[in-house]
Amino acid sequence: MLDRNKLRNNLDFFKKKLVERGVSESQFEAYVQADKAMRKLLHQIELANQKQTLLAQQVAKKKGDPKLLKESKELKQKLEQLNIAFKEAETLSQELLLNLPNIADESVPVGRDETANLELLKEGRKPVFDFTPLPHWELCERLQLVAFDKATKLTGARFVAYTDKAAKLLRAIASLMIDLNKNKYQEWNVPVIVNETSLTGTGQLPKFKDDVFKLENTRYYLSPTLEVQLANLHANEIFTEGELPKYYTATGVNFRQEAGSAGKQTKGTIRLHQFQKVELVKFCKPSEAIHELEEMTRDAEQILLELKIPFRRLLLCSGDMGFSAQKTYDLEVWMAGCNEYREVSSCSSCGDFQARRAMIRYKDLTTGKNTYVATLNGTALAIDRIFAAILEHYQTKAGEVMIPQALLKYLDFDKITKPK
């Protein structure tokens, strides 16, 4: 959530920065007017309270004065009406504020969509095959790794059921990701069901209510990302400065409606309603956030280096970043069978945007004041997508898939062949 006071005192600056994030001028103006209306009512309440205090003193001096008693009664009724109006105005103002995204860091390029993203680096060589490589969904069918039909029977479209070696490979991928960061990040195992407050804290609600699965007749939701659980572990808490920075990680399942994915590639294991990933979350002082983002992104990249899969790093433009992000790097792997790059990680600094919503603070030793922390989150990595990338990158002319060296210690096989 943006700082109300900074917004009020820098309207032109915030209008420019928010328009760069895709906010319409009318949406911004609606918030400004709602905030003004709320403050006007608050001022009227303050004046009425002052008048009520004076009236009380006068009534005490002139006991039983009918005129003063009537005036006091009318003022009391007016105050009640003003307080009701203020609560309504405050609710509207808060709702509109919660729907405004974070503003971009000055280092972020301005742009509408992914075409304005900047490619910063490439690692690894794209494989050269002496045959036509297959996309992962065809390999899944030929090697009987994913029972797409059974998953559809169990649930519906865009769910998958991994079989035997595929299930073991998925578990191995998750283990490698956790193990590579276990000395730096504290591991958690958290619920997959979260409440409205947690989703509001990290920014999924209220704006993206159509993208999350809500449990019927409850205020609970299936979590769309482990960022929600890990970031909200310290909601309404105050760190000592010495406790920062804190690094957390978790692996688990996530659920998304993917309401805006019409027309996008939905074959295979890339874009699912239920998916698995390893998440990294950091809490630090705001002045250290950008440095911590660089470190987090390198932590995610290290996994790809271990797996020896070619990838690139992108700096996302203002219009392509997530709602809560201040600055974001995406990591995309080369999908040899699809002949394209696909995202497997998104690492973001959110500044104090989420901390302000979730009330996560630290005691600043210099000022003695409670100050909002900065939060960061990153996928390290998307497990189903890495599974797909391994199939495409390590496929052979014989129709087999070799297991990357980094995963062999977790498995009792070194290649996947078609079952007899």
Swiss-Prot record:
What's a GO biological-process term for it?
Answer: seryl-tRNA aminoacylation
Chief subcellular location equals cytoplasm
What Pfam families does UniProt report for this protein, alphabetically?
Seryl_tRNA_N, tRNA-synt_2b
Mind telling me which SUPFAM superfamilies this protein's record contains?
Class II aaRS and biotin synthetases, tRNA-binding arm
What this protein catalyses is: tRNA(Ser) + L-serine + ATP = L-seryl-tRNA(Ser) + AMP + diphosphate + H(+); tRNA(Sec) + L-serine + ATP = L-seryl-tRNA(Sec) + AMP + diphosphate + H(+)
Record GO terms (molecular function): ATP binding; serine-tRNA ligase activity
Which enzyme class? ligase
Task: Name the chain's protein.
Answer: Serine--tRNA ligase
Name of the encoding gene: serS
